[in-house]
Amino acid sequence: MTETGVRNGAYGADKFGLKNLAGVTWNPGAPQLYEYALRAGEGVLSADGALCVDTGIFTGRSPKDKYTVRDANTESTVWWGGNQSITAEQFETLYQDFLKHAEGMQLFAQDLYGGADPSFQIKTRVFTEMAWHSLFIRTLLRRPETAALASFVPELTIIDLASFRADPKRHGCQSENVVAIDFTRKIVLIGGTQYAGEMKKSVFTTLNYYLPDKGVLPMHCSANVGPDGDTAIFFGLSGTGKTTLSADPNRTLIGDDEHGWGKDGVFNFEGGCYAKCIKLSAEAEPEIFAASNRFGAILENTVLDPITRKPDFNDGSKTENTRSAYPLESIPNASLTGRAGLPKNVVMLAADAFGVMPPIAKLTPAQAMYHFLSGYTAKVAGTERGVTEPSPVFSTCFGSPFLPRDPSVYGNMLRELIAKHGVDCWLVNTGWTGGIYGTGSRMPIKVTRALLTAALNGSLRNVEFRTDPYFGFAVPTALPGVPSDILDPVKTWADKAAFDVTARKLVGMFQKNFSKFEAMVDAEVRAAQPEAKLAAE
C-alpha cells in the first residue's frame, strides 16, 4: 500500500481495519485534489476555476436512509421518536462490508476539526473514495496547522464510499443508500450516495449529540457580530432569509449554518460555506457569487454552458438544490477565527405565507423556547397542482433531521441561556403581508432590514409594544422610518374577517404540531402557546 502526505504514522488507516488498499493520499490540498478529480472524470472546470460536479441520483440529503446504533449507551440518550435505529450487530456487519469494499481502492484521508473552539472541537478523520468529496470536507470543516497533522489522533472517523451499495436485508436498512452513525464507537459510514452534504451533516449530528453534556448548545443557525462586539444568532429554515440577512456589510460574519453557544460565547463548527446557488447573481448576492466563481470552489449540479464553461445559475434542470461550497475566507467580511462573544440578540426567522404574523415580535424566554421547538415557516404548494393555499412547515429546533437528543434538551438550554444572559429574542416574519400568498405581497426586504437593525442596535427597547391577540407576543406599535400599518398585520388586510379566520387557522396548526411536546415542557412554556391567549377570550 502506497501512502503519501503528512500524517500520524502511528495512527494510520489500518487502525480502522482499512487493509489491502491501493493506497492512501493523506491531507492533500486543493490543487492536488483538483488533479485527482479531473483525472478520474469526477468533474470539470468552470471558466473561472470552480470544480463542477454532479451528485448522481441523490441531489440532497436522504433522511429516510439515516440510522443510529441503538445500544446500552444510546438507549436512553437518543431521541428515538425522531431517529431510526439499527443494532450494534447490524452496524458491525455494515462496517466489515465497507472495509471489504474498500480493498484495492486509492482512498483520500483528511484530518480536520469540527468546531472553532479548541475546548469543544472534535478531531475528525474522513476517508473518501472520491477526490472531490475530500476537497469538499476539507473546505467545510476547519483545517489544523500542518505541524499538528503528524500527531493527529481522531475522535470521530467517517468512511464515505460512494460506490458501496447496502443490502437492506443484511444491514437492516431500507435501501442501497445508507448513513449509519455509531455514537459509542464514534464511527460514521456513508455509502450509496455522492451527495457530499451527508458528510458535513454527520459531523453536525455528532456534535449535536456530545456538546449538550459539555454545557454547549449546538445550533442550526447563522451568526454575525457588530463593530461593538454584539453577537446575533439567526435561526431559520430554508427560504426564510437566514443567509441573506446575516450577510450584513456592517457586521462580521461568523458562519452561515452551524454554531455552538458555550459559556464564553459563540463559535462556528465549520470553516467553509455551503450555499444554495439556484438563481445566484452578482447583483443580489455579490459576495457569494464571487466566492462561487473562483479556484477552490465546488459547484454541485450546476449547469455549465458547453462552450464558455460559464455556470448558468438560473438553470434548475438537474435540481433546485444546486449548491456552492467554498472556504469562509472567500467572504471579505468573514471572521477567520470563527469565534465571537455571548449573543445579545437571537432572531428566529419565519416566512409566513399565511400573512398573519407581524414583521417583528419580541419573545419572552418561555415564548422563545416554544417557537424554537416549533421551528415554523410556511411554503407554497406547487403551481402544477393549481393550489395556492400555503402549507406549514414545522422542523423542531430549526433542524429536526440533525437532532439525536430529545428536542427539549436543546429547547431548555436555549431558554436558560436567554434568561441567564439577558438576551433579547425576536421573531421576524420574512413572508407575506396584506393577505396570504397569492393575495398579499412579500414583506419588503427594506422593512425587514430596518427592523433588524433597530433590534440589533437596541432601538426597539425604547418603543411601545402591544400584545398580539393571537400569538401573545409583544409587537412594536411604531418605529421611525417604518409604516405603522405594516407593524399590525390585520391593518394590511382588506378583509378583516378573513384575517381572523386565517390567523385562527394558523394558531390551530401551531397547537396541533406542539401537542407532541406538551409532556416535555413546563407550565410556563405551555402557557406561552397561542392557545392560552385565545382561550382567554
Curated annotation (Swiss-Prot):
It is an enzyme of class 4 (lyase). One of its GO terms (molecular function) is phosphoenolpyruvate carboxykinase (ATP) activity. Keywords: ATP-binding, Cytoplasm, Decarboxylase, Gluconeogenesis, Lyase, Manganese, Metal-binding, Nucleotide-binding. NCBIfam families: pckA (TIGR00224), PRK09344.1-2 (NF006820), PRK09344.1-3 (NF006821), PRK09344.1-4 (NF006822). Mn(2+) binds at K201, H220, D257. The gene is pckA. Its EC number is 4.1.1.49. ATP binds at K201, H220, G236, L237, S238, G239, T240, G241, K242, T243, T244, E285, R323, T448. Gene3D superfamilies: 3.90.228.20, Phosphoenolpyruvate Carboxykinase, domain 1, Phosphoenolpyruvate Carboxykinase, domain 2. GO terms for biological process: gluconeogenesis. One of its GO terms (cellular component) is cytosol. Substrate binds at R61, Y195, K201, R323. Pathway: Carbohydrate biosynthesis; gluconeogenesis. This is Phosphoenolpyruvate carboxykinase (ATP). Binds 1 Mn(2+) ion per subunit. It comes from Rhodopseudomonas palustris (strain BisA53). Its cofactor is Mn(2+). The keyword ATP-binding applies. It is found in: Cytoplasm. Belongs to the phosphoenolpyruvate carboxykinase (ATP) family. Involved in the gluconeogenesis. Catalyzes the conversion of oxaloacetate (OAA) to phosphoenolpyruvate (PEP) through direct phosphoryl transfer between the nucleoside triphosphate and OAA. It catalyses: oxaloacetate + ATP = phosphoenolpyruvate + ADP + CO2. SUPFAM superfamilies: PEP carboxykinase N-terminal domain (SSF68923), PEP carboxykinase-like (SSF53795).
